[in-house]
Amino acid sequence: MTLNDLLVLPHDQIDYASLDAAVLHELATQNSEPYIATSALAELGARGGPDARAAAVAILAAVPWDRHLVAFAITTLCDVDCGSAIETMERLLGGTHDPKVLGAMVECVLSYPDHFGTGPGHAFTDRLAAKVETVEPDQFTDLDERAAFLARYRST
């Protein structure tokens, strides 16, 4: 099947596990079908390694077109390359107030606290906490996660 053949199928009718990494990368980085993109990225993430990293980096380097995909790409990148995720989140932080995207960043910090305790990661958490505080709490999907993050990283 070609990429176009796959894109006309409902997202839940595609057998992502049977597709090779190159096709999954194409599906993950296309910008017309968000459910397909997210599902393809999920399969790459489940496989781990450089293919998941490459797709997440490509999604995050492109003009954002789906906030859920961007958020998922952030958590995927954090899972496979936390150092690169810190740099990428730092770049994205100044341009977003989207609680979905900020929530993904919060999830990364809480999932990998060792990477955010010192150096660039710690400096990032300070800026992220300041940004999170500017967004109404009820805008976040996970209020407990937001509260836990602010309790731990909010500047005093």
Residue ranges of predicted features:
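Short, conserved active-site loop motifs that form the nucleotide-linked donor/cofactor pocket
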Residues: A85
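Buried hydrophobic core positions in alpha-solenoid tandem helical repeats
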Residues: V23-H25, A55-L60, T88-E90, G121, ...
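Structural detector for internal amphipathic alpha-helices that build alpha-solenoid repeat scaffolds
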Residues: M1-A17, E26-Q30, P34-G49, A58, ...
